[in-house]
Amino acid sequence: RVRRILVVRNDNIGDVLCTTPALRALRRAFPEAHLAILVAEHCRAAVLRNPDLTEVLTYTKAKHRPRGLGLAALWDLTHAIRRLRAQRFDLAIAMRRPFSRSNAWLAYAAGAPFRLGYLPPASHPFRFFLNLGREVGAVASHEVDGCLGLLASIGIPPAGRALHLDPDPEAQAAIRRRLREAGLPPPAPGPGPAGEVAGGSGLALVHISNRRETSRWPLASFAQAADALHERLGLAILLSWSPGDSQNPLFPGDDGKAEEVARGMRARPIFLRTPELRELIAAVSLCNFVLSTDGGIMHIAAALDIPQVVLFGKTGPEHWAPVTEKGQILRSGGRADRISVDEVVAASVEVMSRWGRGKMFAAARGTTGRRTAARGEG
């Protein structure tokens, strides 16, 4: 009988959020089980308040530690493995596709007698890390469906595809204070988007960062689009980015780029520096709209049910599109920088006229209720 289950997901924020439907399916299949997840420390806030989990375990990857602290990283990982083995898990699930040696090794090192995952070729030297699973085949389906499909291989049915994310109330309160200090009347407390602020406006979070070159949008384009969101839709602009210096080898930041975008805007944006993931999650939860490129932020918005427009580069939407009906995906030849500002503004107006706050957005669009399907994958 399976009483203790470990899910291993040691990659990034969006990947972790795409695992949350599988966590729901596991909880429904094993309502009394101890269900734990092991994630990288920087992803902790993505699952810390997840109601399907009994426990969240973390470790810090070596690449996210300062140089010269290799021994500290090894000690941290060794300590994490000791904690895992002490828990005596019955089932460990390596929740990555295709096969990841580091992910499968963590499942193996946990000492569980049953280790489920997507299997590598039969000749792979580390195939023994897993003793249950399925062949990955072509990685064509969505990541959410890949996670659910792995569970289906051992008879666990899905329990929906929606992502789950609970914001930290203390972090939300802190963001409200920061908005007030920035001169923006705070949104009303409570669940869901912030709603109206002074003058009937709402909040748009514009996230400019992306590590992939093909997924970056020109800074001048971000500035023009942000001005259009403010002028046409009456949205106050929260400028969001990966904080820090661009030369930081651990977590490269875009402080300089954020300043450049702000200088290029006619409107005055609110700088929203979020060193901690829980702060970024809280900020998104208080917004009415998100504009971003294809990264973790789009999955945060989807999990929080916030309308969005996402600019995709080379990344395949069939695998990584945000799981939501409230959005549009824009693509152009595998490069985000080929998408025009006019396309982004038109998509934003369309999304907000359909899923925004009613008549204000319909009026901005020049229509009174026409509906068209979003191009995002739900």
Residue ranges of predicted features:
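Catalytic machinery of carbohydrate-active enzymes
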Residues: 1-378
